[in-house]
Design a protein with these regions (language model features):
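Alpha-solenoid helical repeat scaffolds
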Residues: 1-169
Length: 169
């Protein structure tokens, strides 16, 4: 209503009270944030306002991984991959089986040739999502770079044991 009638200050106040209210379900906040992003993009406005809003929401320490995941996707869309790393780490802390977040973290680490970070990402990745063969693949490469040859062999054998006819190869 406030937005439709041009009362921007009241609209922002209402938006803040909704997004900062711990009693509002995460799905509702997620839908509101999607709308905020869409409006911001249509207006070609500065992304810092959206980023600031996400940061304030995350300070509430939600147990739901959807809002931090949306935030990290927003940062990627704005070509701010490095800034997304702590947010993505939070997502995999909340949900270790979140394959998309782990793959995004992996991409950043691989681009930096940070094989120690690849190991830190992929070791829990193979435990949380044993069917995701890509984590075994990158883990084997990182172990090889670290000259941990016994672990290369062990992780390749573990990957073969978890591969099925339906696995992406």
């Amino acid at each position: 209503y406030y937005e439709q009638t041009g009362q921007q200050d009241l609209y922002k106040q209402q938006l803040d009270s909704l997004l900062m209210n711990k009693k509002v379900p995460a799905d509702t906040k997620l839908n509101v944030m999607r709308q905020v992003i869409a409006q911001n993009e249509q207006a070609t406005a500065d992304s810092t306002k959206v980023i600031s809003l996400f940061d304030r929401i995350l300070q509430q320490d939600p147990d739901d991984d959807q809002i931090p995941m949306l935030y990290s996707q927003y940062l990627w869309a704005k070509n701010m991959k490095e800034a997304s790393v702590p947010v993505l780490e939070r997502v995999v802390q909340i949900d270790p089986a979140n394959k998309a977040a782990r793959l995004m973290l992996l991409e950043v680490a691989v681009q930096k040739n940070d094989f120690e970070q690849v190991i830190k990402i992929c070791e829990p990745g193979v435990e949380a999502t044993p069917e995701a063969l890509e984590f075994y693949f990158y883990l084997a490469i990182a172990y090889s770079q670290a000259e941990r040859n016994d672990e290369v062999l062990a992780i390749c054998q573990k990957a073969l044991a978890n591969a099925t006819n339906d696995s992406k190869k």
